[in-house]
Amino acid sequence: MSFPTLNIGDLIAKTPIVQGGMGVGISLSRLASAVANEGGIGVIAGAMIGMKEPDVASNPLEANLRALRREIEKAREATQGIIGVNIMVALTTFAEMVRTSIEAKADVIFSGAGLPMDLPKIFNETCERKKEEFKTKLVPIISSGRAATLIARKWMASTGYKPLEDKAGRAIPVIAAGGVYTGEDIKKYMDLGASGVQMGTRFVATYECDADDRFKQAYIDAKQEDVTIIKSPVGMPGRALVNNFIDSMRDGGKKPFKCIFHCVKTCEQEKTPYCIAAALINAMKGNLERGFAFCGENVSRVNNIVSVHDLISSLQREFDAIINKPAAATVKA
């Protein structure tokens, strides 16, 4: 049987899988369009997306906006499916990136790394300024019920929308994220009430992933003991693969730098041991001696590179196997 669909407003994803937006440069148009072509929601990561632009150091705002528009356009040329953009609230260019994504007609904006309280306001202002009714869906990334409550109150106040879920007959979709690796995991979360799941790690280990092959190889080589939790220079925790770069920072090392990207609001150059943007750009290019790879908790289970098509097909088979598994018989004594 087919996966159940994931419905976000009038968007219908035939495969209830959202590919995680992975920056810097790990998920761009190539990966996103491949996922969308398989019926899922492909997501372009907005963080430092202009890293390859010639003027990124001298004009980071325009370089990033230009690259974002181009990646959305490239994805559109490669698929008729659903394309989203992940934009972190912590970015100094958050509002500009949101506006550009809306104007470029991204289907969905996913936003976390902070509470995206002003997303509806920016959306409405963009519609008014451009005199156009855009259809971009807005999806906050949250980690608690309290955060959901805060966002719901703020968004209702700023949009005037009322909570009419029962009258509309449409449930608000919840997309579960974290540790989703198999079709069985997808079934588990959907049984708990999720409408879909987000997956990141599995999509790194695909031919279509936009990262360098050496970055992907780090995933294949990873063992469970290689996974650690780090606190990034901008104060956010993350799961990463231990390497010499991370070890040197833990030992009190510091890589002096001049801030040229001005990418994250919370970055204080005088207190920051290294430039997170530079480290992640190096990693994306395969230079892991001068950077590191963020990862998911199941990275040690990755053992080969596959196509996006084969990955989603295998997830479908695993999902079907759980559905078709005979119920255990109960034997009375």
Regions found by a protein language model. Name each.
Residues 1-163:
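Active-site entrance/lid segments in N-terminal catalytic domains of soluble metabolic enzymes
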Residues 18, 148, 157-175, 181-333:
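Conserved active-site-proximal phosphate/metal-binding subdomains
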Residues 26, 180-181:
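Residue-level detector of alpha-helix initiation sites
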Residues 45, 86, 141, 177, ...:
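Generic beta-sheet signal
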